[in-house]
């Protein structure tokens, strides 16, 4: 009786695995969405805490703000999941992406207004809820591109792609904030987030 040998792990197996993922219809267009959808958020969100520190916020005050807004972000993710089931992938990414862009741009209102605790909490809560909604929509579409029995590896690759450009942009946000100022940086981040929705539109129109 001939025993079928399992394919040994190695670079060749890995390349064949991911080639199958990338050869799916519409996958290259989806990668362009992954690379760009969170760019505005990555650019702006990294500078929220430094901006508040520059306006006199203590570590304890920032910790409390982070805790409360993180809980709001979880709530936003739950709400986004419910709305995603009704709206579908395309409309969810557009709507939640628009809210995400508005949320990060609204941080410009906090420049010079760090002493207004109520305003800081209101805008930060809105931004985190919008971020949670947009993230869950993005992850849901990522799961739809995962192949049966390869979900873990396929999702991991997409997550790495999503973080690749966003991580580079986020790392440069400090230099841009010094050059442009906080207000301009947040407005630019919102504009980038809004502009990148055109990539979402193009991808889904091509997939129709």
Q: What is each PLM-predicted segment?
A:
Residues 2-31:
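Juxtamembrane intracellular "pre-TM" segments in multi-pass secondary transporters
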Residues 46-62:
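Short amphipathic helix-loop junctions that connect adjacent transmembrane helices
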Residues 76-90, 177-178:
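Helix-to-loop junctions at the C-terminal end of transmembrane segments
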Residues 98-115:
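C-terminal ends and interior cores of transmembrane alpha-helices
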Residues 117-134:
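Hydrophobic core of transmembrane alpha-helices in multi-pass small-molecule transporters
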Residues 132-147:
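Intracellular juxtamembrane helix-capping segments at the cytosolic ends
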Residues 149-178:
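A late C-terminal transmembrane helix in Major Facilitator Superfamily
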Residues 187-208:
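Multi-pass alpha-helical transporter architecture, strongest
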């Amino acid at each position: 009786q001939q025993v079928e040998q399992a394919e040994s792990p190695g670079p060749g197996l890995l390349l064949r695995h991911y080639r199958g993922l990338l050869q799916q219809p519409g996958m290259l267009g989806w990668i362009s969405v992954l690379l760009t959808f969170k760019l505005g958020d990555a650019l702006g969100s990294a500078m929220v805490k430094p901006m508040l520190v520059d306006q006199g916020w203590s570590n304890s005050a920032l910790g409390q703000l982070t805790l409360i807004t993180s809980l709001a972000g979880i709530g936003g993710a739950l709400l986004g999941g419910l709305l995603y089931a009704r709206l579908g992938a395309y409309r969810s990414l557009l709507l939640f992406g628009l809210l995400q862009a508005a949320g990060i741009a609204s941080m410009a209102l906090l420049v010079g207004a760090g002493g207004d605790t109520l305003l800081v909490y209101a805008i930060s809560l809105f931004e985190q809820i919008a971020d949670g909604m947009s993230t869950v929509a993005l992850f849901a579409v990522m799961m739809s591109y995962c192949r049966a029995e390869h979900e873990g590896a396929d999702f991991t690759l997409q997550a790495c792609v999503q973080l690749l450009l966003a991580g580079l942009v986020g790392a440069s946000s400090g230099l841009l904030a010094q050059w442009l100022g906080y207000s301009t940086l947040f407005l630019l981040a919102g504009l980038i987030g809004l502009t990148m929705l055109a990539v979402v539109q193009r991808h889904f129109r091509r997939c129709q």
